[in-house]
Amino acid sequence: MLKIARFLMCCVGAVAAFSPISATGSELKSCGGNTVCPVGDRGYHVMPPDGWDGQTPLPVLIHYHGWGRQGPVPVNHKHIGGATRKLGVLLVAPNGLGKSWSFWRPGSRDTQFTLDVLADVEKRYPINPSQIMVSGYSWGSSMAWRFSCEMGHKVSVLFGISGTLYDQSETCETGPVEIRHVHGLKDTVMDYPYGPNLDETGPIHLWRRTNQCATDPDFQENWSAGQNFRRMHWSDCESGKTITLDIHEGGHWIARGWLAEQLRQLDFTGS
């Protein structure tokens, strides 16, 4: 019995050593996946990548869910959580109040909430502060834009999926280092935001102006990742920041393979 007890104590110690909760935050309630991590009157869901050693600082993707959803949806979504798990990224999925987001005007309550979420994540996981990315789908994408507009100095990459800020004339003090947006031309939920005279670069007008980019993209190309895309890319912006706009012929959905390909290009796995 004594040998068994010693063996069990060793096992418990090994598990504790591998726990993603830091030593200073060991009193925090264990959470992850479908179990919410509480922050104030709501919380968030988190999922580390497969094969993580429990110690190496992780890049973070904050993903805002669509309207009427909550954090477990992106965590369990094959094109969101399925991508981050395989590509070395810690997924953080906040819960919106009333299953929605406050992105319509500057000064969003959800900007501060996101900062509070990040502070809590740092207590539980070692993260790389220079690799904080944001994304979202539909209204969640609009919230990702809002956070990036208000806290761009904290954001390395914005991945927008089928949603923008409605007022593209807004002024953002600073934008993310890199902006990648995807939108369907046949979207009837959050209509494709054409510019004047059906200008297809309309979805990224705010960022093109903020980053002082040329009117026309540097280059265009067709590519595929489960479905076909037409890409426009700006890399000559005076801010030194790049913009990528991917267009597809479909409607309002999370484009198959798109986010995974973006993360793969950034290569957080070291492969």
Question: Where do the model's predicted regions map?
Answer:
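Alpha/beta-hydrolase active-site loop
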Residues: R105-Y125
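Bacterial N-terminal signal peptides
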Residues: M9-A17
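Alpha/beta-hydrolase fold nucleophile elbow
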Residues: P126-S138
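Short glycine-rich catalytic loops that host catalytic nucleophiles or stabilize transition states
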Residues: V182, L245-G250
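Short beta-strand/loop motif that positions the catalytic acidic residue
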Residues: H181-H183, D187
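Conserved alpha/beta-hydrolase "acid-adjacent" motif
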Residues: T188-D199, I254-R256
